[in-house]
């Protein structure tokens, strides 16, 4: 069989494979994908930024896996983490509480917040940087599917394209077997 035919077969089986394996204990096809500016993505992966800010988000992601997409010019999946806790509060209180873990200056924080009356502070833990950042162009080629990065975030399991992309990224990075998973 040609490589293309074999690869197509692999991609068809990928969702089942992804459910059977994990990175850091999290399924490869669950969680949320966050778009992050490259400078902040790098700080998160280095452990220098432990709080990610969002103007809009959902508390349903607390305790869940988060995958990071570094926006242009990097345009790559860079790693993942777990959202330990989500705090929603007035911007002044968020800054006061987390300024040393936000990874930006007060001026940049204020510019981002703008006129928002509340902001979400996502406490990140269990950060797993990918050994090599995986460019969206490489994933688009491997999946033969255009990937449109989310403006802010999206559910991985609700996006067939991103579910496949994140699964491939996990396979390229390295995976471990889920305890108790069924045999393939």
Description of each model-found segment:
Residues 1-31, 35-57, 62, 73-78, ...:
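Contiguous surface segments at macromolecular interaction interfaces
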Residues 67:
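Non-catalytic, usually N-terminal nucleic-acid engagement modules in DNA/RNA processing proteins
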């Amino acid at each position: 069989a040609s490589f293309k035919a074999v690869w197509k077969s692999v991609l068809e089986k990928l969702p089942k494979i992804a459910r059977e394996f994990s990175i850091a204990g999290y399924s490869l096809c669950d969680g949320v994908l966050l778009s992050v500016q490259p400078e902040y993505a790098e700080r998160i992966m280095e452990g220098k930024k432990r709080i990610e800010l969002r103007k809009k988000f959902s508390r349903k992601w607390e305790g869940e896996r988060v995958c990071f997409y570094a926006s242009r010019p990097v345009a790559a999946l860079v790693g993942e983490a777990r959202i330990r806790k989500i705090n929603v509060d007035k911007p002044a209180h968020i800054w006061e509480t987390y300024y040393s873990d936000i990874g930006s200056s007060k001026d940049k924080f204020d510019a981002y917040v703008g006129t928002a009356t509340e902001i979400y502070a996502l406490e990140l833990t269990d950060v797993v940087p990918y050994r090599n950042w995986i460019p969206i162009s490489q994933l688009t080629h491997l999946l033969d599917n255009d990937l449109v990065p989310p403006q802010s975030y999206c559910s991985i399991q609700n996006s067939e394209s991103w579910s496949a992309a994140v699964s491939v990224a996990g396979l390229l990075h390295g995976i471990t077997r889920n305890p108790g998973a069924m045999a393939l």
